[in-house]
Amino acid sequence: MLNVTNLSFTYPRHSQPALKKLNFSLKPNTHVAIIGHNGSGKSTLVKLLGGFLKAPKQTIFFRGQPLEEVGFRQIGILLQDPDMQLLGDTLHQELIFSLENHGVDPKQMDRVIADVLAVVELQGKQFTPLSKLSFGEKQRAVFACLLAVKPELYLLDEAFSMLDGKLASKLKRFIFKVIKEQQKTVINVTHDFNDLFLADEIIFLSKGQLLKQFSPAAIYKQLHLFHQHHFTLPFPWLLAHEVADHLHHEMKGPIEELQDVVDWICKHLK
């Protein structure tokens, strides 16, 4: 579905490239998490895929066609701050604008709007001033605008990093569930290690290069990689890994809290 081929990019007046000969491919209906330090090239990649920056020709292909020829209508972007994407007064205005911009038949708009409001659980709030919505509701409002135009690829650039832990976890699981049900593809740029377990594939970027691509099942076998690149791993992760190693069991799944470690130990000591 998406092929990135020898993608390099250098910002104007910068001597060092932000991306260096990046190569990877994504299959349809795939959830990919991209992780790396600040300066690893994550946000640059999102900007190139989303059309905010102009990529060199013949380096990004969407369904076999150069992205510069296909355009960006099939790509939906969810950013860190929803206020950067919500420019109207109400969600209804935002939805109408998105639908008009994508050439949706005006006769179908009311049905589409009702459907997406139901999906994101914002029924009755389409005419509420956006300034009155909570941060989480605003993120769902942006997601509603994306759902309405049915993109094939969703780009999430640190979309949940400004939410508190529990709300972020609830919202991301909800959004990922909806995208999976639609059988669409998602690229999630993240600093949250537990997001990696929600993905099908993980891309580890370092200094503009693809350092490693692996599956969530191999995460605990790659802890040395995180250490080598000076990531501060969550304490529950480290504890879980040590306990699993001591018990000669393979650790799988997300470890968000110490209670997860306790539950896992109790399960394997029965």
Curated annotation (Swiss-Prot):
ATP binds at residues 36-43. Keywords: ATP-binding, Nucleotide-binding, Transport. SUPFAM superfamilies: P-loop containing nucleoside triphosphate hydrolases. Residues 2-232 form the ABC transporter domain. GO terms for cellular component: ATP-binding cassette (ABC) transporter complex. Pfam families: ABC_tran (PF00005). InterPro entries: AAA+_ATPase, ABC_transporter-like_ATP-bd, ABC_transporter-like_CS, ABC_transpr_CbiO/EcfA_su, ECF_ABC_transporter_ATP-bd, P-loop_NTPase. GO terms for molecular function: ATP binding; ATP hydrolysis activity; ATPase-coupled transmembrane transporter activity. Belongs to the ABC transporter superfamily. This is Putative ABC transporter ATP-binding protein MG304 homolog. The lineage of its organism: Bacteria, Bacillati, Mycoplasmatota, Mycoplasmoidales, Mycoplasmoidaceae.
